[in-house]
């Protein structure tokens, strides 16, 4: 293992026991709730959109290999991008009575979201099916906990660490390669290569005790 070659990890903030986690000095948050067929697992708050300083909550262009991702607007408005990161596919709006309130993205479809407003926060519910409650909570807690700790430490996140998190959740970055089938295949290969190298050569972990408390199996 060549862990001595990797970028230093930031000091980790202990958040494993919090169901509502505050990030970016109060500007954003994640709230985990008990799973049920009628509800969404995750409630996510984004600050107003700032092109010069995007929130850590804005996900990179990505896709899910096996899961469909579902979105439900709670307050504010949200741009949802599908297949292209330059033009919104849909805008979800809580204030427009005739506006779209929910949307779903099937597996192997590039997508991302951002706050459609530059003045108001966005609150949106997120779930994935088929559901993996522990796996999803572990990923979100580690991914955003790490990004926020990097922000506080004033250091750039390690791409290898991010890919270790993403590989553990079967979520490739959407590489801009055409045709689509080739982009999906290349993105999956890039995810596995970077994720495995980051974990088994550089020693990055898919989960840290400060961010996520592993559930005990009975």
Q: What is the role of each PLM region?
A:
Residues 1-68, 72, 79-218:
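Jelly-roll (double-stranded beta-helix
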